[in-house]
């Protein structure tokens, strides 16, 4: 009976390690795909700079530079969040789930995503002033900013949950 229990325990540990490995791979893949999208958007922004000749030269250049700066800020913040996430998954795979270090990691992820949302929202406002005729693009930008803020809010809530669980676990360890 005891051997069966040990086999199940080892199988579940292998399954957990596989899940953590898959999470790290997925995060790295998201980083690569995100970088490719950022480079593609950057190329579009640079090519739009060359279109800035004629009547709307200042508007086109301002819109292109706004887009390039926004893509750079969002890319840096998302990479920071991904790196923090990958490190946190490493700690989780070692069995340390409810720690203050993981709480700080979730808070850092939330902060990075909130900065990304704020950058997109600032770009939305600037582009609204510059390019009034791009209504559909503006709606997409607003929805993207809201998505970043929503995920940042969830990450912040999880950081608070992990903080409380870490305190409870520490108190429980001290009691034992």
Label the predicted regions.
Residues 95-113, 169-176:
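Membrane-helix boundary/juxtamembrane motif in polytopic membrane proteins
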Residues 58-68, 135-146:
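Hydrophobic alpha-helical transmembrane segments
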Residues 139-170:
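Alpha-helical transmembrane segments and their immediate juxtamembrane interface regions
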Residues 14-32:
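Alpha-helical transmembrane segments and their helix-start/interface "positive-inside/aromatic belt" motifs
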Residues 115-135:
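Alpha-helical transmembrane segments and their membrane-interface junctions
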Residues 38-53:
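Membrane-helix interface motif
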Residues 79-99:
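Membrane-helix interface/capping segments
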Residues 54-83:
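Membrane-helix boundary elements
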